[in-house]
Structure formats: structure tokens, C-alpha cells
Amino acid sequence: TDYTQDASLSGTHYQGMTRVATYVKEQRAEYKNVFLSDSGDTIQGTPLTYYYAFMKKDVEDPAMKVMRMMDYDMWVVGNHEFNYGMDILQRQLNYLTSESTETESKVGVSMANYLDANTNNDKTRDWKTWNSYAPYVIKEYDGVKVAVMGIGNPNIANWDVPENWKGIYFAGVVETYKHYEAEMKAKADLIVIVTHSGIDGDPEKSDFIRELVSTTNSIDLVFSGHEHRNGVTKIANTDGKEIPVISPGTKAGVVGRALFTYNKATKTYTV
């Protein structure tokens, strides 16, 4: 989240995607089954991203390119992705999701609550997603199936001008999850949420993780975004079980990591 930054070459607190790439490489060497995702606010916020969005349109955005080169599994769009307008965002998405090459891999995109505005509104839902992006993916690791759902921030309509999110209907987060909940439970042993949201509600209703976890009992892990805080928060679900929420910081200063150990015989896990 928020990978790019303005940084001095002096000092010892270096950040950036080269260090993240090294860490990811180490994790993949140690663990066979790794899922790598990003929770948004990736292509806006610095002179570098502005330059490639507006001045160097014929060259791939470096933030998108590095995700492809690092073989990311999923990207969830953040609210700042819409600041440059839909044309620029769509260009970035088209590149990110283009077919793999010898040096780059296609990256999946998921925002289950971003729906096609042509067929979804406040009164009607057919749950067709914007751009037909998958509402979630199922990954199988040594016989264990994991559902990973991306959820975008629904408050973008209050932050950006309408032309910047033209064609999207923003559905409620809890409503969206519960629409797919039974389907994911039937298909997967574990359910993970990657979302561009903070944890606790605010007056703008842009942070909804506590509401989501505390009103359900099927989510096993959440990766947050939006607040750009760093740390782990545990939230009790409706069964009283504490679910970890990992907040992965900002500007590639830290990497949020969860390690699942799953017992197929008892269908239980530690994280």
C-alpha cells in the first residue's frame, strides 16, 4: 500500500519495493504456498506516479510493473486510484491484468462491492461486478482451499467527482460479503479479506472492518488499507473468536504477513 515516496538518500530508514521484493523472495524460498496481495493507494501521491500518469503515458506505470514482475496474486484498488480519473485508472488496470510474458505475470483484480452501474443501483442488484472482475478467488494449497475476497472502499462517491468513477455502483460492504458468504464457505476451508479500509468507523463511514468482522463468523483473516497504519488488531466475531486484522503500513516500510498452519484432519488452523 502506498509504495512510492519522496525519500532522502541519507539516514538508515530506507523503504521501497526493492526491499519488499527481497523479503518476498525469502518468504517464497522458505514457504511453498504464498499469496501476495496489495490493498491499494498505489498509483497516486508522488511526482513519480504523476509523471507516469500524465507525462509518460506510453510507458508502463512502475507501480503496476513491479507488481507484475513480483508475481502478485491480487490488487485491490484504493480510493486514491480514482484521483487521476477513470481513463488513467483503466489504462493501469488493462496493463496489470494483461497476459503474462516471460518476465511479467498477470495480476488479478478484485473489488467485490464495485458493481456495474448499468445493472445495479439502490433498488436493484444483479451483482455483476465492474469490469467483470472476480469478486473473490479460490486458491488451493496442498489440498487446502482458500477464498480471498477483495473489497474496495465504498465512500469514493463522496470523495471524487462523478466522472472519476463513472460506471461503478458502490455496494455496502457487509451486504456484499453476506451475498457471497455461503458460496465461499461451500468452496473453501479458509476465507481471507483484502480490503482498502481502516478498522473503526468514522463520520465518513470509510472504515468498516470492525463492523464486518463483528457481524459475521466465517472470516479467518483480514488485511486492511486506507488508514496506512502498522500493526495487528484482533476483533471478536459473532462466535466470540478473535480474528486478526493486519495493517501493512505505508510506503513499503513494512510488509504485512500472516502464517496459516492448517490441520486437514480436524479442519482447524492457527494463524
Describe the function of each predicted region:
Residues 1-271:
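Acidic, metal/ion-coordinating pockets
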